[in-house]
Every structure is written in structure tokens, then in C-alpha cells.
């Protein structure tokens, strides 16, 4: 009997040792940069391998501030990839201290300029050559972190058996200060950080069980715009296969500026910090001498006007990363032609109104007076002259009930969302689909049951992300069973699209997500209800933003009387009416 027990214990001990050896071999990966040791993390009823904080570039510190990234030099020994890395230096939202709704987007690790790292989640056992999905965070190009709880890749990687990567990139002036012509601060280095991370993934992901030929990049807001920018940029096109854009596209009005405007903002930053402005060299030297927080504290001062949904340091159309203007590239088909999946949320504007428009509060219904509505319109369309503002007001006012505070509130939500997210994305998708080979469009209109923001904010910008990353699968977070099912469905759509270029299962009996075509323009709702197919998302408003208003502003750009402050003249009103009639006719 004792011999049997001893023998059984020996076998058990041998199995434990073998399991530990298997765990160790799964967690130790030899990349082209060097060896990395990951960690085993629990996920639902199982576990997954995580490799956190792998460097892909040299730290952009000291004289490397504002410069293009340089590849990480190979290291000896084993890199400890068991904890999240630093977050990049950035503006921290302190509007609502202690409020989880806003603080969930703030950095959750120490901030540092040494921040160019990526994180990888790998199914266990390690796959042979599986699909790879690379996440690019949003944050208006002034904020964002790969380490946020809402971006935890373990649920999506585990549930859909994909390798999930999240990368980091410099934001604010650190990533997008642009003095065109200077090698010391060329601009767009945040986008080049992203590209360098994609290059690292391309060169190394096979060692983690991923297939470098089936990489899908996906992102939200500025991350979605970034994804679109890599579709456009010739230097990025070979580093991924497919793309998903959530609530952002490269042509959004806040997502880029001219090189001249980029330079003006860089000089204005220096002026705010008492730098010598005699030359680029002196300006850059001065800005490099400043502490990071000094730059962050004054970055909002460089904007040319008071506005909502505009950010200080963003990509510039430089002739290099972007060979020509975005519109000319879209018109000519000068972009990567592949399958894309993209969409928007129902209430894209509400979050931004809370941070700048008069009359809005998270602690009330935010019923908006007519006076506050008019002020909000001016902040929402800061580039428009008075006639343009009148056109926006006319388009979004219920003139049978123009003093209704709820309608005024919801009208501003629609103005900000249509102008900054929905209609730019619709313009992009229509242009892209003429040349691409498979497009799928969604409209996310489910408000989470546990959302802490007030009801009036609706289905908020950014709040589809938790469904994409599988948070409703976590029982402790108090989502409903229907929301868990929605999250599983969205994850499966995203992953199936990444694997095949089509979000639909080939032999499924469920309703099919139809292709978007320029003729029919079909899209689906994403919510807890059975699938519904619609056509021509926000078409009336998007014709206004994408066609009518630009022509109106162009036609009146040189007319001082029509652009003067105060109420438009009778001449302006007559001009507007005639222009509208002619536009509708022709």
C-alpha cells in the first residue's frame, strides 16, 4: 500500500513538473529583439499568456523628444514582460474628480516619456499561426493609454482565439509638435510610433503564435482616425491586412491640420513658455528643456479659437506620411485596398458638450436655452462664418418648438456628433468603397445598463469599446445577460472579420450583415435586439455637412459682410436662400 501511494505521488509530482515546464516554455519567447518572459493571467474559467510592456522603440527622452522613433536595440538576458509599462505623458482629465465615468480614461500607470511599449495576449496553449488584432487607443491625440482596464485584451484573445496586441504612442506636443522641414520636430511622430510598433509586430508576432500575414488594426476615435491614416499612408500599408474603424476616420475635422497651422501652434506653445522664437533650433532647444508638465499645462492655449471637439497637437498633412491631401488620396484611390469594418455610436456628441458648451451638466437633464443653443452652435462649428452658422441653426432647429430645452440639447448633440464623427466617416466610407473590396458598416445604439453617465447623454462616444473587449462577460461588473450576449456577438463579428474579411460565419443560419455599397448603403444596428438592416445612415444631415455647407462657406469666404460678427444681413439671408435653391436644383 505504501509503495502504491509513493508511486502515485511520484507520478503526480512528475506531471506537476511537466506542467510547470510547459507553462515556462509558453511564457518565455525569443524575439528578434531578445528574450521576453510573460505571465499567466486568469480569464473567466481558464487562463491566458500575457506579455506586458515589451519595448519596440528606444525611449524618446532628452534630445529624442519630438524626434522620429528609433527601433529598440536588441537586449541580452530576459526582458520581464509581466507588468504593464508606463503611460505616455499627457493631459489628465480632472473635470469630475473621483467620478469613474471620466477617470476610467485617465492614465492608470506612472506617466513618463519612456513609454513606447506594447502588450500581447496569447491563447493557451500557444497557437501555431493565428489571426492577430492590434489595438490603437483614442484620446484626441492628446491623451490615451494602452493599459486602461477597458482595453484589457485577455477576454477577446481568449474567447475568439486570436493574438491581441495593444500599442502605445506619444500624444500631445510630444507626439505631434510639427515644425515642417525640421528633422528635430518633423511632426507626426506619434503616427510613426504606431508604425514602428506595427513593424515590430510584423517581424516578431510569429514567435507568439500569430500570423504576420493576417494582422488587423483597429481603433476608436483618434485610434480609428489613426487606422484610417495607416490605410492612406504608403509606408504603413504592408504592415497589416485589414482594418476596423470605430467612431473615427482620417478625414475628421479635428484629426489633422496643415503644416502651416502646425507650425503656428508650435510657435505659440513656445511663446506661452517664454522661449526664444528666432529660429526652429532655439525653439526646439527651449521646449526640450521644459518639464513635461510645463508643456501639458499650456497646450490648450495654442488653439486658434474657442471650440468643442478640437485638439491642439494632431497630425499634419506633411507630404511624407501623407503624400497629398487626404481628399485627393480618397478621390484617386491612393490607399490600401482591402476589407474594412467601421461604424459609429448613436450619440457621438454628448460627451464633448459636457466639457465646453454652456448649460450642460452631468448632474441635471441639461435642458438648453435658446441662447445657450446659439452659443453651442458657434463653439461646435468654429470655422464657420455667420451665414454658415445660420445654416447649421436652420438645419437643426425644430421651428415649431424652438424653445424646447430637450430638443435644443439633443440638437447640439447631433450637431457635434454629425459634424465631427458620423458624417466624416460616411464621407470616408463612400469614397473608400468605390475602390475597396469589402466594407461593413454598423450603428451602435445600445446604452449599457450600468453606465454611470446621465441618461440624456445617450449612447456615448467610446462606450462600444467595453463590448468589443468583452467586459460584459465579467459577472462582477453587473451587465445583463443580454449585454453579455451582445458583447460575445460583437467580439465574434470583429474576430471573424479579422480572420476572413467578412464578419459573417460562412454557414450560419443567423441574419447576415450585408456589404455596404455606394448604391444601397446598407448597415446594421448593434444592440441587444435581433439584427435589423437599414440604409443610408444620417443621409439628410450628411449631405448637409459633406456637400452643402462646404460649398456655402466657400462661396461666402471672401464676402466680408456675410462673415462679419453679429447677425447676418438681409443680403446674407437672401444669398443663403438663393444658394440653397440653386444647390438643390443643380
UniProtKB/Swiss-Prot annotation:
Matching SUPFAM superfamilies: alpha/beta-Hydrolases (SSF53474)
Keyword Signal (UniProt): yes
EC number(s) from the headed UniProt entry: 3.1.1.7
GO terms for biological process, alphabetical: acetylcholine catabolic process in synaptic cleft; choline metabolic process
Lipid attachment locations (GPI-anchor amidated serine): 564
Regulation of its function: Inhibited by substrate concentrations above 0.5 mM.
Glycosylation sites: 80, 437, 478, 554
Coiled-coil annotated residue ranges, if any: none
Signal sequence residues: 1-21
Name this protein carries in UniProt: Acetylcholinesterase
Amino acid at each position: 500500500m505504501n509503495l502504491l501511494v509513493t508511486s502515485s505521488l511520484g507520478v503526480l509530482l512528475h506531471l506537476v513538473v511537466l506542467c510547470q515546464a510547459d507553462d515556462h516554455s509558453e511564457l518565455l519567447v525569443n524575439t528578434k529583439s531578445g528574450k521576453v518572459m510573460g505571465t499567466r493571467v486568469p480569464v473567466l474559467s481558464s487562463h491566458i499568456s500575457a506579455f506586458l510592456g515589451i519595448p519596440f522603440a528606444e525611449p524618446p527622452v532628452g534630445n529624442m523628444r519630438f524626434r522620429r522613433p528609433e527601433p529598440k536595440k536588441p537586449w541580452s538576458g530576459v526582458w520581464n514582460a509581466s507588468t504593464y509599462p508606463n503611460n505616455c505623458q499627457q493631459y489628465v482629465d480632472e473635470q469630475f474628480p473621483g467620478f469613474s465615468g471620466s477617470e476610467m480614461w485617465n492614465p492608470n500607470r506612472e506617466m513618463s516619456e519612456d513609454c513606447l511599449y506594447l502588450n500581447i495576449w496569447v491563447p493557451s496553449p500557444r497557437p501555431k499561426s493565428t489571426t492577430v488584432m492590434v489595438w490603437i487607443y483614442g484620446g484626441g491625440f492628446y491623451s490615451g493609454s494602452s493599459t486602461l482596464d477597458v482595453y484589457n485584451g485577455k477576454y477577446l484573445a481568449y474567447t475568439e482565439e486570436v493574438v491581441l496586441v495593444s500599442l502605445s504612442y506619444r500624444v500631445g506636443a510630444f507626439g505631434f509638435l510639427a515644425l515642417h522641414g525640421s528633422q528635430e520636430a518633423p511632426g507626426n511622430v506619434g503616427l510613426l510610433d504606431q508604425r514602428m510598433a506595427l513593424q515590430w509586430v510584423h517581424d516578431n508576432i510569429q514567435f507568439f503564435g500569430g500570423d504576420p500575414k493576417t494582422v488587423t488594426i483597429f481603433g476608436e476615435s483618434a485610434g480609428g482616425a489613426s487606422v484610417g491614416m495607416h490605410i492612406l499612408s504608403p509606408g504603413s500599408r504592408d504592415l497589416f491586412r485589414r482594418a476596423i474603424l470605430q467612431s473615427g476616420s482620417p478625414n475628421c475635422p479635428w484629426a489633422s491640420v496643415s503644416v502651416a497651422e502646425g507650425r503656428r501652434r508650435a510657435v505659440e506653445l513656445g511663446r506661452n513658455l517664454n522661449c526664444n522664437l528666432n529660429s526652429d533650433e532655439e525653439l526646439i532647444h527651449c521646449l526640450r528643456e521644459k518639464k513635461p508638465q510645463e508643456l501639458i499645462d499650456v497646450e490648450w492655449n495654442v488653439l486658434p479659437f474657442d471650440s468643442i471637439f478640437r485638439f491642439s497637437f494632431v497630425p499634419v498633412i506633411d507630404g511624407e506620411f501623407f503624400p497629398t491631401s487626404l481628399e485627393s488620396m480618397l478621390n484617386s484611390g491612393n490607399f490600401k485596398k482591402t476589407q474594412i469594418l467601421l461604424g459609429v455610436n448613436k450619440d457621438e456628441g454628448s460627451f464633448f458638450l459636457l466639457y465646453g458648451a454652456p448649460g450642460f451638466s452631468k448632474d441635471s437633464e441639461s435642458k438648453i436655452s435658446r441662447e445657450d443653443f446659439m452659443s453651442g452652435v458657434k463653439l461646435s462649428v468654429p470655422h464657420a462664418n455667420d451665414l454658415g452658422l445660420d445654416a447649421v441653426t436652420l438645419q437643426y432647429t425644430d421651428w415649431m418648438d424652438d424653445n424646447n430645452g430637450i430638443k435644443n440639447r439633443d440638437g447640439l448633440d447631433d450637431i457635434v456628433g454629425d459634424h465631427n464623427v458620423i458624417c466624416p466617416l460616411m464621407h470616408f466610407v463612400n469614397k473608400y468603397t468605390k475602390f475597396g473590396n469589402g466594407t461593413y458598416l454598423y450603428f451602435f445604439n445600445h446604452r449599457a445598463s450600468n453606465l454611470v453617465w446621465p441618461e440624456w447623454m445617450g449612447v456615448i462616444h467610446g462606450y462600444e469599446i467595453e463590448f468589443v473587449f468583452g467586459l460584459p462577460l465579467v459577472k462582477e461588473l453587473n451587465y445583463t445577460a443580454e449585454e453579455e450576449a451582445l458583447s460575445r456577438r460583437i467580439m465574434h463579428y470583429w474576430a471573424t472579420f479579422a480572420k476572413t474579411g467578412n464578419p459573417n460565419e460562412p454557414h450560419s443560419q443567423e441574419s447576415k450583415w450585408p456589404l455596404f455599397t455606394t448604391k444601397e448603403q446598407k448597415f446594421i444596428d448593434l444592440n441587444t435586439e435581433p439584427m435589423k438592416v437599414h440604409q443610408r445612415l444620417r443621409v439628410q444631415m450628411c449631405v448637409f455637412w459633406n456637400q452643402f455647407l462646404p460649398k456655402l462657406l466657400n462661396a461666402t469666404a471672401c464676402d466680408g459682410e456675410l462673415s462679419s460678427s453679429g447677425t447676418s444681413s438681409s443680403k446674407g439671408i437672401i444669398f443663403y436662400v438663393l444658394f440653397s435653391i440653386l444647390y438643390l436644383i443643380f
